[in-house]
Regions:
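Mobile-element integrase/transposase regions
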Residues: 1-35, 41, 57-62, 66-69, ...
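Basic, flexible linker segments flanking DNA-binding modules
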Residues: 1-13, 111-112, 169-176, 186
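Hydrophobic (often cysteine-bearing) scaffold residues that line and stabilize catalytic clefts
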Residues: 11, 31, 52, 56, ...
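A short acidic/small-residue loop/turn micro-motif
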Residues: 36-37, 47-54
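Cysteine/selenocysteine-centered motifs that mediate thiol-based redox chemistry or coordinate metal-sulfur cofactors
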Residues: 69-89
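C-terminal domain-tail junction helix/linker
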Residues: 76, 98-102, 123-210
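RNase H-like polynucleotidyl transferase catalytic core
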Residues: 77-84, 98-117, 133-137
Length: 210
């Protein structure tokens, strides 16, 4: 079940959704994002003037090109998880998904938490990016690019055992967590050693004073 069984590897399932921004003097712009469900890594994004099936396809093309899943032999192509918006239920997107040999899973109506990861990402991102006004689309794109870079490579996630999405996406998390465990064990051993020495040091000091 796509909703109750957690993914176990990168590129097993991608979550996608739109959110919106207002550019002063230009009107509304719509951000299409694709997030890897396992690592929370933002694989691709695109700032669009509409929320059409073609915009979804364009973002998917970027994600496929970035990951190379169409150029290597894989057990199965990533499944796409989305809501039931018009652009996601269109026959145009269905034909595209079939041509890419990808399965499309849509969330149950009135249960938006099935896309919880992408929705949380968009909320977090908008809390930062919307702190200022934008007067040109390229200004907004620039800030979005900065945020994605920070989110993927520098923002630690508690749900990922305090590593970054990039660490998980590129398979570095085991090495990082092992190194942390070694440092933790070494620190604890050093503390125990110092604690064992403390009473002896105090006793020697007392004798010297006498």
């Amino acid at each position: 079940n796509a909703f109750t069984n957690p993914t176990k590897q990168v590129n097993e399932m991608w979550q996608t959704d739109f959110t919106y921004f207002k550019v002063v003097g230009w009107g509304w712009y719509y951000l299409s994002s694709i997030l890897d469900d396992f690592s929370r890594f933002i694989i691709a994004w695109e700032l669009c003037t509409t929320m059409a099936a073609g915009d979804v396809q364009s973002t998917l093309n970027k994600a496929i090109a970035f990951t190379g899943v169409d150029r290597v032999k894989v057990k199965h192509r990533p499944r796409l998880l989305s809501d039931n918006g018009p652009c996601y239920v269109s026959s145009q997107l269905a034909e595209y998904m079939e041509s890419r040999e990808m399965k499309h899973v849509r969330g149950a109506p009135y249960h938006p938490m099935t896309q919880g990861k992408i929705e949380r990402y968009h909320r977090t991102m908008k809390n930062i990016v919307k702190l200022q006004h934008y007067y040109f689309p390229w200004e907004l794109e620039q800030e979005l690019s900065k945020f994605v870079e920070h989110y993927n490579h520098h923002r630690y996630h508690e749900s990922l055992k305090n590593v970054t999405p990039a660490d998980v996406f590129y398979g570095r998390q085991r090495k990082i967590l092992s190194a942390r465990d070694r440092i933790k064990r070494k620190t604890m051993e050093e503390r125990r050693r110092l604690n064992l020495r403390s009473p002896l040091i105090s006793k020697v000091d007392t004798i010297v004073q006498i």
